[in-house]
C-alpha cells in the first residue's frame, strides 16, 4: 500500500490487538505520556485472553512462601522450555520467567486485579505449584481492568477495525496502518478504509 496523501488519524503509538499483550502495551505507552489507540477487529476487546482461566505462572509469590514451596525463575524457564518441546526462544523464556513476579505485581498494583492470595495451583507441566488464579477465575478480569486503565490514561479503543496493511516508507520504516472501520467478521472487504499514522511505533500484538 502506498503512503496516503492524507492520514485520517495520528497517534504516537498504534497497538494492534487488545488481548493481554496489547492491553499491557497500551497501559505502559499511555503511562509514559504517549497518545495511543488500540485496534481490535472483533466487536469486543480481549480476544482469547478473555477465555483463559485467569491463571498466571509466577515464582516467588507470598503464597508460595507461606506454603514453603521452593521455586525459582530458572526452574520455571526449564519447565517452559521442556513443555514447549524446545521450540521456545531460550532468551525470551528466561526473560518471561525472571519477570513473572514483577508482572504479577504489576497487575495487582497498576491494574487493580484481585487474585486468590490464599493458594497457588499446580498447573500441568509445572514442577511445582506456582499458578496464581484471579478471584473471578477468568482472564477477562485482567483485560477489563487493563483496558479501563489504558482509557483512563487517554488511550482510544477502536473495535470492529480490521488491519488491511502496514504502510512503510521506501526505506522500510513503518509509518502507520491501512484499516477498515465497521468491519464485519470475517468479511475482509467490509468496512470503510481509513489510514492511521503512528508517529513513534506500531505494536503488533494480535493473535
What are these regions (language model features)?
Residues 8-11, 186-201:
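Core beta-strand elements of the Rossmann-like FAD/NAD(P) dinucleotide-binding domain
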Residues 24:
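Short alpha-helical segment within the catalytic ATP-binding CA
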Residues 42, 183, 199-201, 205-207:
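Glycine-/small-residue-rich beta->alpha transition segments that form the dinucleotide
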Residues 29:
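Aromatic pocket-lining residues of Rossmann-like dinucleotide-binding sites
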Residues 4-21, 37:
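Beta1/beta-strand and adjacent pyrophosphate-binding region of the FAD-binding site
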Residues 18, 60, 181, 206-207:
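Glycine-rich, N-terminal phosphate-binding loop of Rossmann-like dinucleotide-binding domains
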Amino acid at each position: 500500500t502506498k503512503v496516503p496523501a492524507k492520514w485520517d488519524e495520528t497517534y504516537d503509538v498504534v497497538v494492534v490487538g487488545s488481548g493481554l499483550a496489547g492491553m499491557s502495551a497500551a497501559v505502559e505507552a499511555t503511562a509514559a505520556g504517549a497518545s495511543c489507540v488500540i485496534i481490535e477487529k472483533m466487536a469486543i476487546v480481549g480476544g482469547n485472553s478473555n477465555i483463559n482461566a485467569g491463571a498466571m505462572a509466577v515464582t516467588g509469590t507470598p503464597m508460595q512462601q507461606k506454603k514453603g514451596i521452593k521455586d525459582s525463575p530458572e526452574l520455571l524457564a526449564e519447565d517452559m522450555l521442556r513443555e514447549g518441546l524446545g521450540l521456545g526462544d531460550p532468551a525470551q523464556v528466561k526473560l518471561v520467567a525472571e519477570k513473572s513476579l514483577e508482572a504479577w505485581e504489576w497487575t495487582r498494583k497498576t491494574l487493580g486485579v484481585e487474585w486468590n492470595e490464599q493458594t497457588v495451583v499446580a498447573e500441568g507441566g509445572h514442577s511445582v505449584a506456582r499458578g496464581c488464579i484471579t478471584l473471578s477465575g477468568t482472564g477477562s478480569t485482567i483485560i477489563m481492568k487493563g483496558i479501563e486503565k489504558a482509557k483512563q490514561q487517554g488511550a482510544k479503543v477502536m473495535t470492529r477495525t480490521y488491519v488491511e496493511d502496514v504502510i512503510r516508507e521506501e526505506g522500510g520504516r513503518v509509518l502507520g496502518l491501512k484499516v477498515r472501520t465497521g468491519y464485519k467478521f470475517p468479511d475482509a472487504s467490509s468496512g470503510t478504509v481509513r489510514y492511521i499514522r503512528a508517529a513513534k511505533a506500531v505494536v503488533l500484538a494480535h493473535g
